[in-house]
Amino acid sequence: MKPTVFALGLMTAALGSAALSVPAVAQSSAQHPAYQAAILDSARPEDEKARDAFRAPAEMLAFAEVREGQRIADIRPGAGYFTRLFAKVVGPTGHVYAFVPNRTAERENPRADVLTAAYPNVSRLNGDLDAMTYDQPLDLVFMSQEYHDFHIPRFGVDVAKMNADIFKALKPGGLYVVIDHQAAAGTGKSAIETLHRIEGDFLRQEVEKAGFIYEAESPAVANPADDHSLNVFDDAIRGRTDQFVYRFRKPG
């Protein structure tokens, strides 16, 4: 699920230079004019703009290497915080698929339809997470604070098959970017239902098994003050969880 996340600007001092695993050139590219224009777009809802300080949109766009003309799948996009940004950056020559799983479609389709009505380059796509297909190869598959949910039995997802389908859907050289709430070291996926967290190393190993190359991690929404012991919806930590952001690349 999607509680608000914590921004790079608030965390840099606490993290220190050792934690900055993204090259400086990637961080400076967050100032790309297209990213700034998307963030400043007057059509964005005010409640989404109010969350920018905590969701690091420019850093996320830069880390995901979003560019004009790309085709992007935003998996379970919710209200479309990132979908709107992607739509503005890829422009009329690109396309964004708002992928809504069949199991949650009744509740989530209306929100996706708001996005398709507002952006002609966005379309809603329904399907099973472990049977995803797209009409053209993708440049980017993006998943924010959702991966852990897909391990919960009620979602009925074969996560290994999901990752394999994402690998297949991407162009050679395409990216798979995942944001999620960090769990305590050594806990793997054991906290997915109790705390809504997943251990980053566990997720990384799962994705690599699908053939992806782990390329980089961004500290943009990290919070070292989070000890990983609380449910992400607990008021003591909600909106300030420690989150990892991993970038995987399909070889080619």
PLM regions and their residue ranges:
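Class I SAM-dependent methyltransferase Rossmann-like catalytic core
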Residues: Y35-F63, R67
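Conserved class I S-adenosyl-L-methionine
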Residues: E68-G78
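A short acidic, Gly/Pro-enriched loop at the edge of an enzyme's catalytic core
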Residues: Y119, M132-F142
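A short SAM/SAH-binding and catalytic strip from SAM-dependent methyltransferases
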Residues: D139-A160
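Conserved beta-strand signature within the Rossmann-like core of class I S-adenosyl-L-methionine
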Residues: G173-H181
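Conserved Class I S-adenosyl-L-methionine
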Residues: G188-A216
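Core SAM-dependent methyltransferase catalytic element
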Residues: A225-G252
